[in-house]
Amino acid sequence: MVSSFTSAPRSGFYYFAQGWKLVSQPGIRRFVILPLLVNILLMGGAFWWLFTQLDVWIPTLMSYVPDWLQWLSYLLWPLAVISVLLVFGYFFSTIANWIAAPFNGLLAEQLEARLTGATPPDTGIFGIMKDVPRIMKREWQKFAWYLPRAIVLLILYFIPGIGQTVAPVLWFLFSAWMLAIQYCDYPFDNHKVPFKEMRTALRTRKITNMQFGALTSLFTMIPLLNLFIMPVAVCGATAMWVDCYRDKHAMWR
C-alpha cells in the first residue's frame, strides 16, 4: 500500500494522532504485539508501584519549599506530583524502549514499507537477533547523550524555590525532546543514519518534534493510556519520517 501522506509540513500533533490510526492497520497489528506486551508489563507494574508511594514522596519533595513560598503550596503540590510522574514515566519508558528496541525497529520498518510501497531488507527473527548488538549500541548512545543532561535537571529539583517551580517546566521540555529523539530514531536507525546526523535532522523541524514529544510525554503519565503509548509513538514517528526525512536519508527505497 503506497502512502497517502504528502510532503507538506504537518504538526507534531498530527503525527501523534496518525500513530493511533496506524497502529491498528491490518498487517501492522502483529508487529505491535511484542512492544505492546513489554510496555503493558513494565509500565503497568511501575505505575501501580508509583501510586502506592506518592503519599510518601510528595511530602518529602514539598519539604524543600522555602518558608517564603509556603503560601503557594496549593499550586506547588500539583507541580510536585507532575514532576514525579514526568521523571518516573520517562525513566521507565526508557527501560521499556531498551527491552523492546529490536521489535520497535521492526515495527517501524514494516510500517514504512506499507506507507511507501518500498521493499525493506530481508528481516525476520534471525535478522533481528543478528542486529541486536548494533541496536543496543544505538540505545546506549541515546542514553549516554541523555544521562548528563538529566542529572543536571534532577539536581535543580533540590534547589529551594527553583526545584518546585522552574525545574518541572525544564524537565517537561527536556523529556519532550528526548522522547522525540527516542521514537524518531527507530526509522532513522533502520536506514543506518548516524545518531548525530539524526539529531541534526530533527532540529530542522524542532517545533514539530517538540509537539510530538510533548504529547507522548503527557500520555506517558496517564494511567491505562500509557500502556499503549510505545507502539503508537513508533507509528507516529515513522509517519513523520516518511513525510519529512525519508527523501534525504533513506538507504532502501
Curated annotation (Swiss-Prot):
The chain crosses the membrane at residues 31-51, 75-95, 151-171, 222-242. One of its GO terms (molecular function) is sulfate transmembrane transporter activity. It is a multi-pass membrane protein. Keywords: Amino-acid biosynthesis, Cell inner membrane, Cell membrane, Cysteine biosynthesis, Membrane, Sulfate transport, Transmembrane, Transmembrane helix, Transport. It holds the Pfam family EI24. Residues 52-74, 172-221 are periplasmic. Residues 1-30, 96-150, 243-253 are cytoplasmic. GO terms for cellular component: plasma membrane. One of its GO terms (biological process) is cysteine biosynthetic process. Inhibited by sulfite. This is Sulfate transporter CysZ. It comes from Escherichia coli (strain K12).
